[in-house]
Regions:
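Intrinsically disordered, low-complexity Pro/Gly/Ser/Thr-rich segments with frequent PxxP/GP/PP motifs
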Residues: 156-174, 245-273, 347-374, 443-469
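Solenoidal tandem-repeat scaffolds enriched in leucines and small polar residues
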Residues: 252-343, 350, 354
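Hydrophobic alpha-helical membrane segments, chiefly transmembrane helices and signal peptide h-regions
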Residues: 91-112, 278-280, 287, 337-339, ...
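Solvent-exposed, non-transmembrane segments of extracytoplasmic/periplasmic domains
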Residues: 145-209, 216-220, 224-226, 232-241, ...
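Short, aromatic- and glycine-rich surface loops/edge beta-strands on solvent-exposed regions
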Residues: 174-184, 274-283, 376-384, 465-483
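Short acidic, flexible loop segments centered on an aromatic residue
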Residues: 125, 130-131, 225-245, 282-283, ...
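Terminal targeting segments of Actinobacterial cell-envelope proteins
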Residues: 1-90
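Conserved functional hotspot residues at active sites or interaction interfaces
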Residues: 85-145, 188-226, 287-330, 387-432, ...
């Protein structure tokens, strides 16, 4: 019976029976129908939000005291309530509303045209690069070039002029600078100095925090430190000699102001005439260091290069009378080095160079004059730890010039900008023949094709007729360099990555 308060009855009035809803087992309203009401087979119904009409209420016949008609009765009875009855829970209604909204949003998103929703393909963005050319000796000229149409060139890092390339600029004994802007192809450059049959040819290189240069006669040499940065650099120099590390007090903490060049005479610290290697480290800033040597029989300018486990020395000139390998071990453990020569008839191991052992922090020299026998070769040096190497060569007997063959790179794409013509040498250290196509672009745009095939483990030679930008593409990695046509100098070709150092960036046009 209901707990609802009842009114008083009249004398002739019969009490009225009030029906109550049975309590639900799982909430305020029943969601199931008894088997008798549902029939023999249960009907599967889709879930839907509760409507107030779904809640069972006594039909009008019930309220009149008559038996209810099953056809008009609700499936579930509504509990009787008074005026203070609470509101029903409307959670299912909100759930359905949110579901409908989600479907609508999904349909609207699908309706947006694909061209409006898809960001453009990522574009390759390349950063600019600056090369520094160490000061040479005498009247020197800077050759700068790239596959692109122009570069910024000059003798001061903060005062460069845009120049159509390839181009040759006189810089005398100043440092040179070559800069590409963002989006341009990487630059290459070299400095050539020729005077009375004595030639130096040095590549322009990027700044770094460390590097090494090897010299045959420190008593007639100096180091030139170039700081192209906008902040001061603090440089340490360590010399490695035949007996180990040389005491070089005063070569620590050398300060080089922004945009300045500082000359360090090596004879002050080492007046010996045996080969040494100078290790350069910059604690602050990035620098380029070159070494200059002079002697009655020649002169040379050398750019620093990093130590490496594999060192390639390309374009060893033919018909040299002297060939001395200078190798240094910058590590703290004994180092074993193997040498392979890549000659025109195939690879071979030079006599005495099959296994070279070097003490820690020391420099040695190995005579390879007879082993190379005056052949045009490329050398490959390998070790389990980083090493530093150069090949000192001297021309025919009676000549007065010499050269230090410096490290080159192994790559499918090689480039260099030449201030003069010469002999191109390409070496293949792989096990399969490599075909290559090359183009020499001269000032004014004239192009000369240079094509050929380099057998496995051998060296190919060909003429480069004039100054210009040389671009070589091989079917597999090659190493290469150009031997000067006058005097004796060797310029290594630079590896050019098939994609620039820039990162791929996706620009979304919808973002503002």
């Amino acid at each position: 019976m209901s707990d609802r308060p009842r009114r008083a009855l009249a004398d002739d009035e019969e009490p009225e029976e009030i029906f109550e809803a049975e309590p639900g087992e799982a909430g305020l309203a029943r969601r199931a129908v008894d088997a008798e009401d549902a029939g023999d087979e249960p009907v599967v119904r889709a879930a839907r939000a509760m409507d107030p009409d779904d809640v069972a209420t006594p039909d009008e016949d019930d309220l009149d005291g008559n038996d209810g008609d099953p056809s008009t009765a609700s499936a579930v009875e509504r509990p009787a309530t008074d005026d203070k009855a609470g509101h029903y829970w409307k959670g299912p209604v909100w759930a359905v509303t949110l579901a409908v909204a989600a479907v609508a949003i999904s349909l609207l998103t699908t309706a947006i045209p694909e061209s409006q929703r898809t960001a453009p393909a990522a574009q390759l963005i390349s950063s600019g690069r600056t090369l520094v050319c160490p000061p040479s000796q005498g009247k020197a000229s800077l050759a700068a070039g790239s596959v692109g149409g122009s570069l910024h060139v000059g003798t001061s890092a903060d005062k460069l002029s845009e120049t159509s390339v390839p181009a040759v600029t006189k810089i005398d004994n100043s440092a040179g600078f070559v800069r590409s802007m963002a989006g341009q192809h990487p630059p290459t450059g070299s400095v050539l100095s020729a005077d009375h049959g004595k030639t130096t040819w040095v590549p322009c290189v990027g700044t770094a925090t460390d590097g090494a240069v090897s010299l045959t006669n420190p008593s007639a040499s100096d180091l030139v430190v170039v700081n192209a940065d906008t902040r001061a650099a603090t440089v340490d120099v360590t010399l490695l000699g035949s007996k180990g590390e040389i005491d070089t007090a005063g070569m620590r903490g050398i300060r080089v102001s922004p945009g300045q060049t500082k000359v360090l005479p090596l004879s002050v610290w080492n007046n010996d005439t045996t080969p040494v290697t100078a290790l350069i480290g910059s604690r602050e800033g990035r620098v380029v260091v070159g070494a200059r040597t002079w002697a009655p029989k020649g002169r040379e300018t050398i750019a620093m290069a990093p130590a490496s486990k594999t060192v390639y020395l390309p374009a060893v000139p033919a018909k040299v009378s002297t060939a001395t390998l200078v190798i240094s071990n910058p590590g703290t453990t004994r180092l074993g080095v193997s040498v392979t020569a890549l000659a025109g008839h195939g690879p071979f191991t030079p006599d005495g160079a099959d296994q070279i052992d070097i003490d820690p922090r020391s420099t040695i020299q190995v005579d390879m004059s007879k082993a190379l026998a005056g052949e045009a070769v490329g050398l490959k040096l390998s070790a389990h730890d980083p090493l530093v190497a150069r090949l000192f060569v001297q021309g025919k007997h009676g000549t007065t010039d010499y050269a230090l063959v410096g490290p080159g790179s192994s790559s499918k794409v090689l480039e260099q900008t030449l201030g003069a013509g010469g002999t191109l040498e390409l070496s293949n250290s792989g096990g399969e023949a490599v075909t290559f196509t090359g183009t020499l672009t001269a000032d004014g745009g004239k192009k000369t094709a240079v094509n050929g095939t380099v057998p496995a483990g051998s060296t190919w030679s060909g003429k480069v007729p004039a100054a210009g930008h040389l671009h070589v593409v091989g079917s597999a990695p090659l190493i290469g360099g150009v031997v000067s046509g006058s005097g004796l100098a060797v310029l290594p070709l630079e590896a050019i990555a098939t994609s620039t150092n820039g990162r791929r960036a996706t620009v979304d046009p919808l973002l503002r």
